[in-house]
């Protein structure tokens, strides 16, 4: 089992680089890195397809957090194959260069990765601690305000209505995928007829005309108030106020097999609302084109994050709620 504090690293590089990184991870108490794989120079020069297949077999059930490539030894074919493979698994990619590379790719900014200077493949503002602090402060302030001003009196009121609509709990806890692929329990007001979990463990998507939705559930869903308990998730550290919406476990696996770079959305905490949500791409869907648009907006949010963007999304979400224009069902 991979704990939150552990980060798994795989390296495409020389034996010298492997020794340097291994020594650093063993000696540095702050690294929180587990160097779990390595391919040396000769391996890198073999057929890319063979190498990726070999790599897949080796770590079939492994979660990869960081994928380090010595870009001075890699051609464009292997580079493309490597990044497609790594990003499909939700890994961050870092390029280390021992000598000038002939590769012509648009890359991110230089940063320190362990003992190396590296170039990240994607712009990721929330990788900076100051930005993480800003986002966490915004999350905690807004969540505390919502819980103290609204949730404390809204819960017993809506709880009575939920109980009158049928048997079952007031708040349900659903398994969802969070940051770095960590599973967590997402809280929501119950909006559907209470059923025992299916024997196959699969949770089915809700559609617009789903007869399982109760009368009070329709109101809660239309106004997004069913997600009010998720502000507790924010204070618990599972979620953020703004971010990609959390997907169900079985849904996550299915989408990852169909949409490239889907798991990049794991780079940040899932949110109560998000850029994709305010653009109208929300709710369950089996339409791959709509899902692709949602993922595109999620990645755009990750790469262009700013505190102002979070504030803007929160304001737009609130406006959509009070004007009953949430696109929810």
For each of these PLM feature ranges, what is it?
Residues 100-110, 171-212, 273-294:
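Short, glycine-rich, amphipathic interfacial segments at transmembrane boundaries or analogous
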Residues 206-269, 313-317, 321:
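A short, structured surface patch at a secondary-structure boundary
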Residues 130-195, 233, 307-329:
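A hydrophobic, helix-centered structural microdomain
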Residues 259-329:
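C-terminal terminal-structure detector
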Residues 1-151:
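N-terminal hydrophobic signal-anchor/signal peptide
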